[in-house]
């Protein structure tokens, strides 16, 4: 939403009453009665599901799902481990209002831990997504010489450096 310019985390606001109704389903905030009036930075800080649903709606399903794809969700990372799963992402043609809402705050998808780490790493390193590796290199135990090594493998850009900087600030603010 930041990359697309549909929200300013510090200027745009949201009122959290404690829940939002989406397609007849009530999506609640973890805080009974809600958080009240907050900036979208505060929405992230407080992990407010209704506020993130609003962000998902501002972005729209096509753009949200294009970013899921861009960050590698729904496909294998190519990590050097056997049995990697691609996770589970709704097909775009089956995404309605409720699927958009739950996907926006992370409960409408199933991702692997390595996909999550790879995506968060891209967010905080300037937007560059790299192929993950378990081992950087193998060394011969007696001489300590490199037997095999893996170079950093750039995959693609995901977000701008400016958005990355804003997200680093937001993620630090969450902590």
Predicted segments — roles?
Residues 2-175:
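Beta-lactam-recognizing serine transpeptidase/beta-lactamase-like catalytic domain environment
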């Amino acid at each position: 939403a930041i990359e697309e310019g549909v929200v300013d985390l510090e200027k745009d606001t949201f009122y959290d009453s404690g829940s939002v109704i989406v397609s007849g389903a009530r999506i609640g905030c973890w805080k009974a009665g809600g958080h009240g009036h907050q900036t979208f930075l505060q929405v992230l800080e407080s992990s407010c599901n209704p506020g993130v649903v609003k962000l998902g709606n501002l972005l729209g399903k096509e753009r949200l799902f294009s970013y899921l794809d861009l960050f590698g969700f729904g496909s294998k990372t190519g990590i050097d481990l056997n049995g990697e799963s691609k996770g589970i992402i709704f097909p775009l043609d089956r995404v309605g209002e409720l699927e958009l809402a739950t996907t926006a705050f992370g409960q409408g998808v199933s991702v692997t831990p390595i996909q999550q780490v790879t995506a968060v790493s891209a967010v905080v390193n300037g937007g560059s997504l790299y192929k993950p590796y378990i081992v950087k290199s193998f060394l011969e135990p007696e001489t300590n010489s490199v037997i095999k090594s893996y170079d950093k493998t750039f995959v693609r850009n995901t977000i701008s450096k400016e958005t990355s900087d804003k997200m680093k600030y937001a993620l630090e603010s969450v902590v």
